[in-house]
Structures are given as C-alpha cells and as structure tokens.
A protein has these predicted regions:
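ATP-binding/phosphotransfer module of carbohydrate and carboxylate kinases, centering on a glycine-rich
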Residues: 28-163
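Phosphate-binding/catalytic loop of phosphoryl-transfer enzymes
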Residues: 1-39
C-alpha cells in the first residue's frame, strides 16, 4: 500500500497532540493557573517543589524545554484515574485521532496500529477514545524492536535467502 502524508508534523509548540509535551503543557498551565484539584496540586508541590519563576525559566530560557515539559508525563500517569486528568487524557487522545487518523478517507473501515510507551501506558484511554470515534485499533506495541525483528526475518531475510 502506498502511504502519503495528510497532516504535517508541527512539533511540540504547534502540534504534538497526545504526546508527553502536550499533556505536560496542560499540567503546567493548569498548575500555574491554579486549576488543578487540590490533591493533585499538593502532590505536584511535594514532588517537584517548583515555583512559577522556575517553571517559566525552564520553559522559556533553558535549552530543551520540550524535554522538561514532557518529563511530567510519569506524574500525569500516576494521576490518570483522577477525573480531572482522565478527562483531559481522553480528550487529548480524541484530538490526536481527529487530526492524525480521521484525516484519511475511509478511516473507519481501516484499523490503526500504535507504537510507543505512551500509547501502551494509556491503552485503556486510547481504546475508549477510539471506540467513541468509531476507530478500530488493531495493535498497541510498547517496544517495537521485537516485532521489527520478526518482520525482517519473515519478509526480508526470507526473500534474500530464497534468491
């Protein structure tokens, strides 16, 4: 099958829907706007002890702000059963699916495959978002090395050995 790009990758500032930096931006802005539920805010304070000025400095003045922002994903995963975080996770995944899956013709007749830690860690939420949107997920692979080796053995090496 021929694939072609429908949606450009816009990076963590303009895009990156459903990524660690996408969710990290939400967490940090919610924290700085005092919108986090108290138990999450208190836990954030206890775990990180970051002031507004420190966060602003790391995001706007230090190198690799995307790495800093995405580094809060384990904290978000720890709180994913809280309705405030859970709702945002599911809505973020729906946004990802709208932008990167629904752009293809007949997407509802195809199945989608996901690779990576975040999709594996958010499997339940991803399944829920996809189901609500009529998207069929065929597989979620946390670490693709094993399946890649299997593919190469089955399709690439096999052909080379026959010829």
């Amino acid at each position: 099958n021929d694939l072609h790009e429908e949606v450009p990758a816009l990076g963590y500032v303009l895009g990156d829907e459903g990524s660690g930096s996408y969710y990290g931006k939400f967490l940090l802005s919610s924290y700085l706007y005092n919108k986090l539920p108290k138990e999450i805010s208190d836990s954030f304070d206890k775990k990180f002890g970051l002031s507004k000025d420190e966060i602003i400095d790391k995001v706007y003045k230090q190198p690799n702000p995307n790495v800093f922002i995405a580094s809060f994903m384990p904290f978000i995963i720890d709180w994913k059963n809280n309705p405030f975080i859970s709702d945002f996770i599911v809505n973020g995944l729906k946004h990802f699916l709208e932008v990167h899956v629904c752009c293809y013709q007949n997407y509802e007749k195809s199945s989608v495959h996901f690779v990576g830690s975040l999709s594996a860690l958010l499997k339940e939420e991803l399944d829920m978002a996809a189901k609500e949107m009529g998207i069929v997920i065929n597989s979620i692979v946390q670490k693709p090395v094993g399946p890649l080796v299997d593919y190469h053995i089955k399709y690439i090496l096999d052909k080379q050995l026959v010829n």
